Design a protein with these regions (language model features):
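Conserved beta-strand elements of the Class I
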Residues: 57-61, 81
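Short, basic/glycine-rich phosphate-binding loops at helix/coil junctions
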Residues: 18-26, 74-80, 108-112, 198-199
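Charged helix-capping and loop-helix junction motifs
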Residues: 123-133, 164-172
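Oxyanion-hole/transition-state-stabilizing segment in secreted/luminal serine hydrolases
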Residues: 66-79, 90-128, 136, 147, ...
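N-terminal secretory targeting modules
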Residues: 1-57, 71, 227-234
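A short helix->loop->beta-strand "cap" motif at the edges of active sites that frequently abuts
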Residues: 141-145
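Catalytic His-Asp segment of secreted/periplasmic serine-dependent ester chemistry enzymes
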Residues: 153-234
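Second-shell loop/turn segments in exported
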Residues: 82-86, 115-123, 161-162, 204-208
Length: 234
């Protein structure tokens, strides 16, 4: 645990990494997939790959927003696996989707893409990667209920990153359309976190990640999907 915490503390978090810090001989495509170069990503992926696969109820799949939260405690009435990796991208998720599929989860809650945007990945490329993720889940795990979550707003005054909430909303609309295409449920939490067009400062310390109150809002939204489906199954 101490080693993992140290790696997390010292990781080259994609949310804070400038692609120009990569070696000069690296290609642009490698720069935009810098998540592969972090020891934290490699360590977490190897840990997940080492687990004996068993049928599971719920998997949360994503980046630091997922990774940082104690989903098992927040959803203590449900069997939950946290498959978040701080700094991850849509490409990183594609690189490790096999482990998720092998677990044969009843549900997958997917939140990914903000790090792609920070890296300057074109929206069309993010959408293409996302479609590949959903293709794999639909084809190889057809009984899994997939919940595509909207990207969260950011607070540009706090982040220090040139992120644009208008672009985030554009991507969210595309994710909603993909959800409909694959007959998956789209969870739009963006409106519940936004205030005056920005991530509500009461829900964040850095303008990008959530604090405890922000996670409480998110958890409430997730629980509503459990309750809705339980009622539908009665």
């Amino acid at each position: 645990l101490a080693i993992l915490l140290a790696l997390a503390e010292n990781q080259t978090d994609f949310l804070r990494t400038n692609a120009n810090e990569m070696p000069e001989n690296d290609s642009e495509s490698k720069k935009k997939n810098i998540t592969y170069y972090t020891k934290y990503y490699q360590t977490k992926k190897s840990i997940y790959d080492s687990y004996t696969h068993k049928d599971s109820e719920t998997i949360f799949l994503g980046d630091s927003l997922t990774d940082y939260y104690e989903w098992g405690e927040a959803l203590s009435d449900h069997e939950v696996l946290n498959r978040g990796i701080a700094g991850d991208t849509t490409t990183g998720v594609l690189n490790r989707i096999d482990e998720v599929v092998k677990a044969k989860p009843d549900r997958v809650y997917l939140l990914i893409g903000i790090n792609d945007m920070i890296a300057g990945q074109p929206i069309n490329k993010i959408e293409t990667n996302y479609k590949q993720i959903l293709d794999i889940l639909k084809t190889r795990s057809p009984n899994t209920k997939v919940y595509v979550q909207s990207l969260f707003p950011v607070n540009t005054a706090l982040t220090g990153h040139p992120l644009n909430n208008a672009t985030i909303r554009d991507l969210n609309k595309r994710l909603e359309d993909l959800s409909n295409l694959y007959d998956y449920q789209y969870i739009d939490i963006y409106p519940e976190l936004v205030e005056f067009g920005q991530l509500n400062k009461d829900f964040t310390f850095d303008g990008l990640h959530l604090n405890g109150e922000g996670y409480r809002i998110w958890t409430r939204k997730i629980l509503s999907t459990y309750n809705t489906n339980e009622e539908a199954e009665k």
